[in-house]
């Protein structure tokens, strides 16, 4: 399968080069393809700030901030704070890569919120450590356990100290909800600092997941390591950027690139802004660790919401003081929670969502959008009126 995919990529590259040489029709490349997140924010006329935060275990994370919108720049008073946390293989650009009137980060800023966007360890913008380098295996020895235990507390506490606020609204997408459910159920002091949890396409159990990722997850751990190594998994690269700006801007291949975005999550291509595909693909995937993917593989195999299994009783005892990984209990989380799910979501399957809903102690709202898949929550053309306006209304209701 790996060779077939490589062959397909080579064919696309050769065909693109031939097409360009013979005058094949390309659409204009969006300027954001070569921008970082701060530059994208500034490009759309919003104020942009960037901060580096060190976690308890030494990782250095990048936080992006939009302190106010274009419409309310004269209001210097404190604003309610929103923290946006991306999903698996993603980064903070997810919240600002659509047009300004359809990206949640920009919409919240214009609605009067102080918007902060996190970057999980190991992605494009969080590849530094106090003592380790990305060339060392030790740097990549993490999964969503550490993102919940270290990344979220460090980021949220920094934001509260910087803004002087006592609480934040937390918006998570996909794995951003996973680490939220873990952190807010395991760390009561952190949970008290969350005014409301907005869970978009939440993923806790993957018992009914139909994504190709689930098939990958059923492979033996040793085979996954043999295929992908021990370090990073699907990082953003110069080659991926080249594909995004050359292959994905070709009139004929643009739709193929759009469909590749849906390959792991479900198909709803009519709800994707095809003129933005080059921006999406030059920022995502943004990478994670192979160990994080192994953790998701374990979730598929064991069908449990639990910490990473280190593979032996001795190693588990070293990490957890017990011979098996501890389980996470969503019911222990008391944060008011609103959930949105999609009827065609291959990752956050309807049946898994129904199980999760019974476990949320303080569920204040749930809506299922029948036609939506996993990426509609961040890039859907109809997301502003079907989702984002409702999020803002709930924030104002529970302020």
UniProtKB/Swiss-Prot annotation:
The lineage of its organism: Eukaryota, Metazoa, Chordata, Craniata, Vertebrata. The gene is LIPA. Catalyzes the deacylation of cholesteryl ester core lipids of endocytosed low density lipoproteins to generate free fatty acids and cholesterol. Hydrolyzes triglycerides (1,2,3-triacylglycerol) and diglycerides (such as 1,2-diacylglycerol and 1,3-diacylglycerol) with preference for the acyl moieties at the sn-1 or sn-3 positions. Keywords: Glycoprotein, Hydrolase, Lipid degradation, Lipid metabolism, Lysosome, Signal. PANTHER family: LYSOSOMAL ACID LIPASE-RELATED. Glycosylation is not essential for catalytic activity. Pfam families: Abhydrolase_1. Belongs to the AB hydrolase superfamily. Lipase family. Monomer. Residues 80-380 form the AB hydrolase-1 domain. The active site is at residues 174, 374. One of its GO terms (molecular function) is sterol ester esterase activity. Its main location: other. One of its GO terms (cellular component) is lysosome. It catalyses: a sterol ester + H2O = a sterol + a fatty acid + H(+); cholesteryl (9Z-octadecenoate) + H2O = cholesterol + (9Z)-octadecenoate + H(+); a triacylglycerol + H2O = a 1,2-diacylglycerol + a fatty acid + H(+); 1,2-di-(9Z-octadecenoyl)-glycerol + (9Z)-octadecenoate + H(+) = 1,2,3-tri-(9Z-octadecenoyl)-glycerol + H2O. This is Lysosomal acid lipase/cholesteryl ester hydrolase. Residues 28-76 form a propeptide. PROSITE patterns: LIPASE_SER (PS00120). Glycans are attached at residues 36, 72, 101, 161, 273, 321. Residues 1-27 form the signal peptide. The keyword Cell membrane does not apply. It is found in: Lysosome. Its EC number is 3.1.1.13. It is an enzyme of class 3 (hydrolase). GO terms for biological process: lipid catabolic process.
């Amino acid at each position: 399968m790996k060779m077939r995919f490589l062959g397909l990529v080579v064919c696309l590259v050769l065909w693109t080069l031939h097409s360009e040489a013979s005058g094949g029709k390309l659409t204009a490349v969006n300027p954001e393809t070569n921008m970082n997140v701060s530059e994208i924010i500034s490009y759309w006329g919003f104020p942009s700030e960037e901060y580096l935060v060190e976690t308890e275990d030494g990782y250095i994370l990048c936080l992006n901030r939009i302190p106010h919108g274009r419409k309310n720049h004269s209001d210097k008073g404190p604003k309610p704070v929103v923290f946006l946390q991306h999903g698996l293989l993603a980064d903070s650009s997810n919240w600002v890569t659509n047009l300004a009137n359809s990206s949640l980060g920009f919409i919240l800023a214009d609605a009067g919120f102080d918007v902060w966007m996190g970057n999980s360890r190991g992605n494009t913008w969080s590849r530094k450590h106090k003592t380790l380098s990305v060339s060392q295996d030790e740097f990549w020895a993490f999964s969503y356990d550490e993102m919940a235990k270290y990344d979220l507390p460090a980021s949220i506490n920094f934001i509260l100290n910087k803004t002087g606020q006592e609480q934040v609204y937390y918006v998570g997408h996909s794995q951003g909800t996973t680490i939220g459910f873990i952190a807010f159920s395991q760390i009561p002091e952190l949970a008290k600092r969350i005014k409301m949890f907005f869970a978009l396409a939440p993923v806790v159990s993957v018992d009914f997941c139909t994504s190709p990722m689930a098939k990958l997850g059923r492979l033996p751990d040793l085979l996954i390591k043999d295929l992908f190594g021990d370090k990073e998994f699907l990082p953003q690269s110069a080659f991926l950027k080249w594909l995004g700006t050359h292959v994905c801007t070709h009139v004929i291949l643009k739709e193929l690139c759009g469909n590749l975005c849906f390959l792991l999550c479900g198909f709803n291509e009519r709800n994707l802004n095809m003129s933005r595909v080059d921006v999406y693909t030059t920022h995502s995937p943004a990478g994670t660790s192979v160990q994080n993917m192994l953790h998701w593989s374990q979730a598929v195999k064991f069908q449990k919401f639990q910490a990473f299994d280190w593979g032996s009783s001795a190693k588990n005892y070293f990490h957890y003081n017990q011979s098996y990984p501890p389980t996470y209990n969503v019911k222990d989380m008391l944060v008011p929670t609103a959930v949105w799910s999609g009827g065609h979501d291959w990752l956050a399957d309807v049946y898994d969502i129904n199980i999760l809903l019974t476990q949320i102690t303080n569920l204040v709202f749930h809506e299922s959008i029948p036609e939506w898949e996993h990426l509609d929550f961040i890039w859907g053309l109809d997301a502003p009126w079907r989702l984002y306006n409702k999020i803002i209304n709930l924030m104002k209701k529970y302020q």
